């Protein structure tokens, strides 16, 4: 089966609320495809209530829409999990003087009313009968000739779903068929559950754009130009910066309508952290999107330089249907003819301090400031230290060396050999622990230089990863 496909009968396993959310997400994607905000779609309430209430309401502020799965700019969707024969249709929308006021209002506004029935998979004659039942029910309304009516069965719903890859990722995840690692728009920076995840725009993080002649912008100054660049270029966009500067959260903000103006279309966003070896691979996913001509913005976090270069060439050659954003801590040999590079860096502790107070409110302002200063604004390091602060403890009198010991030892007994091995591993920018294609064994070379056997260094790497001191990118590791 193709990546962006699903058996239509699998949708029967959706709950009532999931069905309503699916239709809402599809409506948002359809509205966004027409160049309007997904905020034009509203949905809430009980899907099972037979009261003619509105499940999903689309209100696009224009006079006419280009025909598609949405025909009128004002459209009401009624979502039903069960079958909807003629008798059920009449009960749902009423007839004559008992006609639902929702239907009458849609007719008055020359809008559209669509029943989506998951339980039905109609033949052409079956759909015709249901549409006739809907039309007969409204025939006595004075504005009935202005009302657009339609009936979407399971086949129509799956046809609509196939047009929107990001929504397909969502529904597959709900059905337990999600692809390993791939996600639609969401909290990609993975904040702890229950923690506020609004973007921190404090001074201390600067962003340099490729056309900015080296000018360093604040986050709130850079968001809109970043969006404009991603929309206009046919090149891949590479977001670089040291670990802990907030690259992923800033990319997430590009799709957030509450940040800046004219947000990127979140309904076409497809995200994956390549460090977790996704299935399908990033290459296979891009090839599929390009082959099917799907509009998508593909975000690859922790994307190695080699993978970026390979995919950037494909995106540049294909045009603008698929936009590619990759995130990584370095740039290396990215080719300017296929890549726009945006660099993010920290200058000061302010953002890290605010993040600590948000994540660990009991830590106190003074401790948060001390940790952020020690970490030199690096949020990843700051969070690792803050996790080990005891209730009521003060760090004011701890030296930098003592704070480093706390970060490194993490309540384990001091281990001079492990620290020495970490120092050896930190001499290089990064190192490979296993690469069948490599001409040299990098861990073996580091072992020769240090006097430690390769297996001992390998074990050290494993321990350091458990302490979140080593980062992982495929077979690459870095202190």
Language-model segments: residues:
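Winged-helix-like regulatory helical subdomains adjacent to P-loop NTPase cores
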Residues: 87, 91-106, 120, 170-224, ...
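Hydrophobic anchor at the beta1->P-loop junction of P-loop NTPases
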Residues: 239
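Conserved P-loop NTPase "ATPase switch" module shared by AAA+ and STAND
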Residues: 268-318
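Sensor-1/coupling segment of RecA-like P-loop NTPase cores
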Residues: 121-124, 304-311, 315-342
């Amino acid at each position: 089966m193709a990546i962006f496909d699903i058996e239509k009968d699998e949708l029967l396993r959706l709950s009532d609320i999931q069905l309503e959310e699916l239709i809402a997400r599809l409506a948002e994607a359809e509205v966004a495809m027409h160049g309007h905000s997904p905020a034009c779609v509203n949905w809430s309430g009980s899907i099972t209530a037979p009261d003619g209430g509105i499940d999903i309401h689309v209100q696009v502020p224009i006079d006419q829409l280009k025909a598609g799965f949405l025909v009128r700019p004002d459209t009401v969707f009624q979502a039903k999990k069960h079958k909807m024969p003629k008798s059920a249709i009449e009960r749902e929308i009423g007839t004559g003087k008992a006609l639902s006021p929702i239907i009458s209002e849609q007719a008055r506004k020359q809008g559209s009313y669509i029943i989506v029935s998951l339980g039905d998979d109609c033949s052409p004659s079956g759909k015709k009968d249901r549409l006739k039942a809907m039309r007969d029910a409204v025939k006595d309304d004075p504005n009935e000739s202005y009302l657009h009516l339609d009936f979407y069965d399971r086949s129509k719903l799956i046809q609509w779903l196939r047009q929107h890859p990001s929504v397909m990722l969502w529904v597959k995840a709900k059905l337990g068929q999600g692809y390993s690692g791939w996600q639609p728009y969401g909290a990609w920076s993975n904040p702890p559950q229950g923690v506020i995840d609004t973007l921190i725009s404090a001074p201390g993080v600067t962003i340099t754009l490729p056309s900015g002649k080296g000018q360093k912008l604040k986050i709130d100054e850079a968001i809109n130009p970043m969006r404009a660049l991603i929309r206009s270029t046919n090149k891949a966009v590479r977001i670089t910066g040291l670990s802990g500067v907030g690259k992923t959260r800033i990319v997430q903000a590009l799709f957030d309508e509450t940040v800046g103006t004219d947000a990127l279309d979140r309904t076409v966003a497809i995200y994956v952290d390549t460090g977790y070896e996704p299935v399908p691979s990033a290459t296979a996913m891009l090839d599929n999107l390009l082959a099917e001509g799907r509009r998508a913005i593909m975000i690859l976090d922790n994307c190695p330089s080699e993978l970026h270069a390979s995919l950037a060439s494909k995106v540049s050659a294909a045009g603008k249907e698929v936009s590619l954003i990759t995130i990584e801590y370095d740039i290396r040999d990215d080719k300017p003819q296929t890549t726009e590079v945006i660099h993010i860096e920290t200058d000061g502790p302010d953002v890290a301090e605010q993040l600590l107070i948000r994540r660990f409110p009991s830590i106190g302002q003074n401790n948060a400031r001390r940790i952020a200063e020690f970490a030199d604004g690096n949020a990843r390091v700051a969070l690792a230290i803050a996790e080990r602060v005891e209730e009521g403890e003060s760090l004011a009198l701890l030296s930098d060396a003592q704070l480093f010991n706390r970060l490194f030892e993490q309540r384990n007994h001091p281990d001079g050999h492990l620290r020495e091995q970490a120092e050896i591993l930190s001499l290089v920018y990064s190192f490979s622990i296993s690469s069948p294609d490599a001409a040299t064994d990098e861990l073996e070379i580091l072992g020769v230089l240090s006097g430690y056997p390769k297996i001992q260094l390998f074990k050290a790497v494993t321990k350091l990863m458990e302490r979140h001191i080593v980062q992982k990118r495929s077979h690459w590791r870095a202190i």
